[in-house]
Swiss-Prot record:
This is Transposase for insertion sequence element IS4351. Residues 156-317 form the Integrase catalytic domain. GO terms for biological process: DNA integration; DNA transposition. Keywords: DNA recombination, DNA-binding, Plasmid, Transposable element, Transposition.
Length: 326
């Protein structure tokens, strides 16, 4: 089946939506896959009303086609902004997304990447501001290090389904990153809905200091927290103490199911942009840790519509305040 919609098919979609017919039935009627119809309506409907008309849809499709074949011009103002945001730790995708969110003209992220690599070929250094993708780091030495039976462990299967929706603030994920030769450790906590992160240097990798630092780090948002999810490391053996002092529920992933804490794994990767693999964490200061935390909480995220975690946090809190008042 074709993935491209013709002008005649757009007219048919417009008419059938008015009947109304389901998107699946429309797809069968015009001979395309239902995903093609869903994508067509989503891309070419009216942004404000959500309604679909053949005329508007065709104009949008024609404009998109023209832009695709038009060479993008990287203006001096764009170059200046790109360099500024690269130095702040933004990726090309974040530069484009944030610029469009703020109504600032910007080329595509593909064009930015091409410009960066052209700069590299000329001996430039812009590429050094890009994150290194695909790098793996050892958090606890061997695969089985730090694992064992945790008394009172509550499995992730018991966690409320609402946590999966990522709609409310206060469903957190927690982890530790261990430095070179097991020297020093860092505690990372992040919120699933907003990507807001708390990073703290640990005085030790044992369960008692981990619990103490976790409670201290979250004291200001204690009344907003619902759950915390961790892996099965022994450093979280004092989970009941954390749960009691924060008045929340504490859950554990299944062994070696790191994807069940996907947001936290991603956050740890972002931290590695600033603290590379092989770094002795005992050399990292609390001031540096706070600087990294501030950077990540004020960096736009694609999954947040290029809002920053702090902006998304304020948005959710404000929405909840309005709902409560109503």
């Amino acid at each position: 089946m074709s993935k491209h919609i013709t002008e005649e098919q757009r007219y048919a979609i417009s008419m059938m939506l008015q009947i109304p017919m389901s998107k699946k039935a429309i797809a069968e009627a015009i001979g395309v896959d239902k995903s093609t119809v869903y994508r067509e309506i989503k891309r070419n409907c009216d942004a404000r009303s959500g309604s679909y008309s053949m005329e508007l849809a065709q104009r949008k499709a024609d404009r998109r086609k023209q832009q695709k074949h038009r060479k993008e011009v990287l203006t001096p103002a764009m170059r200046k902004r790109i360099i500024k945001l690269l130095k702040k730790g933004f990726s090309p995708e974040q530069i484009v997304g944030r610029s469009r969110l703020e109504g600032i003209a910007m080329v595509s992220h593909e064009t930015i990447y091409r410009w960066i690599w052209e700069d590299k070929r000329r001996g430039g250094k812009l590429h050094k501001y890009l994150r290194r993708q695909g790098r793996r780091y050892a958090k606890r030495g061997s695969k089985n290090a730090g694992r064992g039976f945790i008394p009172g462990r509550v499995d992730i299967d018991e966690r409320p389904e609402i946590v999966e929706l990522k709609e409310r603030f206060g469903d957190l994920e927690i982890d530790t990153i261990i430095g070179k030769n097991h020297k020093g450790a860092i505690l990372t906590i992040n919120d699933r809905a907003t990507s807001r992160v708390w990073i703290r240097k640990l005085s030790g990798k044992e369960a008692i200091p981990v619990a103490k630092i976790a409670v201290w780090a979250l004291r200001k948002v204690k009344n907003l927290i619902h759950t915390i999810t961790a892996d099965n490391g022994k450093e979280f053996a004092k989970h009941e103490e954390i749960a009691q002092k924060l008045e929340i529920k504490f859950y554990f992933c299944k062994p070696y199911h790191s994807w069940e804490r996907g947001a936290n794994e991603n956050t740890n990767g972002l931290i590695r942009q600033y603290i590379p693999k092989g770094k002795d964490f005992s050399e990292v200061t609390n001031k540096q840790i706070k600087w990294i935390e501030n950077k990540l909480n004020n960096r736009p995220r694609k999954r947040l519509g290029y809002l920053t975690p702090n902006e998304k946090f304020k948005q959710i809190i404000n929405q909840n305040s309005v709902a409560f008042a109503s």
